[in-house]
Curated annotation (Swiss-Prot):
Main localization, broad class: membrane
Compartments where located: Cell inner membrane
Name this protein carries in UniProt: Taurine import ATP-binding protein TauB
UniProt keyword terms in alphabetical order: ATP-binding, Cell inner membrane, Cell membrane, Membrane, Nucleotide-binding, Translocase, Transport
Organism: Pseudomonas fluorescens (strain Pf0-1)
Primary role: Part of the ABC transporter complex TauABC involved in taurine import. Responsible for energy coupling to the transport system.
Similarity comment: family membership: Belongs to the ABC transporter superfamily. Taurine importer (TC 3.A.1.17.1) family.
A GO CC term attached to the entry: plasma membrane
InterPro entries: AAA+_ATPase, ABC_transporter-like_ATP-bd, ABC_transporter-like_CS, ABC_transporter_ATP-bind, P-loop_NTPase
Length: 264
């Protein structure tokens, strides 16, 4: 059963002669981790912004639990690449911030915040200031904050793009652990091919100008990690390597097509 459904979505910004997205249809169901991958200009961030309710489509329909998406909502938690944390607040207050805005009593919101910090392995960091945290720790706080409101769907906008390679791998593995424990459906966008193949249960490849889905893949590598197989073993599996190379070739062919159009 689909929780989130996009039906023939197109998006065009005011003053732009061309749509940024064209005829996008997809569904996100329980326990899916849907990853959108594509070159620059393929509309990945625009697609996430539509689902988040930050902008409205120029055509088509987006529903969550059969209710039209109209504006931002706590039912769609968002984790940004830029952590967007409050530097004047400590970690606990940052995680509890959305609950405070929703009028949740202090003891209940702090209890929930502590539970989410434990989920992302940050117990003991409650009273640290944001400036005292590493990049990976800040992203853990952002993830805990998004989960604190118990959203129906978790949206992630290139959440690990600014991290070093080692921390990025740690965060990928943490995300899979959190995804398994919470059973939250996740929609994540990335420009990193190996990350996309490793994390996704479902992978959509977007072509640019305008952004449209050109291929869909059903994968199980992230599920294998969540079931206990090591990331190293998975990423050295010939099937993983073959899938990664297939996706790489597809993305490069789309990029080459764009470059030919620009030279024409």
């Amino acid at each position: 059963m689909a929780l989130l459904q996009l039906e023939r979505i197109s998006a065009q910004y005011p003053g732009s002669p061309e749509p940024v997205l064209s005829d996008i249809s997809l569904t996100l169901g329980p326990q899916q981790l849907l990853v959108a991958l594509g070159p620059s200009g393929s509309g990945k961030t625009s697609l996430l912004n539509l689902i988040a309710g930050f902008v409205e489509p120029s055509a088509g329909r987006i529903t969550l639990d059969n209710v039209p998406v109209k504006g931002p909502s706590a039912e769609r938690g968002v984790v940004f690449q830029d952590d967007a944390l409050l530097p004047w607040q400590d970690v606990l207050a940052n995680v509890a911030f959305g609950l405070e805005l929703a009028g949740v009593a202090k003891d209940k919101r702090e209890q929930r915040a502590r539970e989410m910090l434990a989920l992302v392995d940050l117990s003991g960091f409650e009273h640290r200031r944001i400036w005292q945290l590493s990049g990976g720790q800040k992203q853990r706080v952002g993830l805990a904050r998004a989960l604190a409101a118990d959203p129906r769907v978790l949206l992630m906008d290139e959440p690990f793009g600014a991290l070093d390679a080692f921390t990025r791998e740690q965060m990928q593995e943490l995300l899979l652990q959190v995804w398994q424990r919470t059973a939250k459906p996740v929609f994540l966008i990335t420009h990193d091919i190996e990350e996309a193949v490793f994390l996704a249960t479902d992978l959509i490849l977007l072509a640019p100008n305008p952004g449209q889905i050109v291929e869909r893949l059903h994968l199980d590598f992230g599920q294998r990690y969540a079931a206990g197989e090591s990331a190293r073993a998975i990423k050295s599996d010939p099937r993983f390597i073959e899938t990664r190379e297939h996706v790489l070739a597809k993305v490069f062919s789309q990029r080459s097509a764009v470059q030919r159009q620009e030279r024409a």
